[in-house]
Amino acid sequence: MNVLIVDDNQSITNMLQKYLSIKGFEVEVSNNGKIGLSLIQKNQYHAVLLDLSMPDFSGLDLIEHLERTDSLKNQTIILFTASSVSNDIISSLLNKDGIKACLRKPVHLAELVQTLSAV
């Protein structure tokens, strides 16, 4: 199962990449929303782990771009974000095609693997 992690926090992406690789996932990482979008457009992923709060080109920007190009419904996106993001925003995002779950940081690794396995 191949997974793309899009998060600007390199320590988080390194930790998640190592853990998921040990669990048998093939993992690619982008520390930038624009590069993440480019990878999504070029490759097929079983799931995309997407941080909402990134500088310059956020996870919300990436989702909006995928919606505009009618590509969101073809994705499996699991959001992960800081607790500062409101529940209303999370609820509205979870109603969009392609967005399957939202995990709050700090992400519990066992919950992440369980969520990935369920999608």
Where are the predicted features?
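Hydrophobic/aromatic residues positioned on beta-strands within the core alpha/beta folds
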Residues: 80-82
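Active-site residues of response regulator receiver
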Residues: 51
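Short acidic/polar segment at the start of the alpha1 helix of CheY-like receiver
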Residues: 9-13, 86, 109
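Short hydrophobic/Thr-rich beta-strand motif most characteristic of the beta2 strand and flanking loop
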Residues: 24-31, 39, 103
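Acidic catalytic/metal-coordinating carboxylates
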Residues: 31-35, 58-64
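Two-component/phosphorelay signaling modules centered on CheY-like receiver
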Residues: 10-28, 96-97
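Alpha4 helix (beta4-alpha4-beta5 surface) of REC/receiver domains from two-component response regulators
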Residues: 61, 84-102, 110, 114
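Receiver (REC) domain active-site loop signature in two-component systems and cognate sites
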Residues: 54
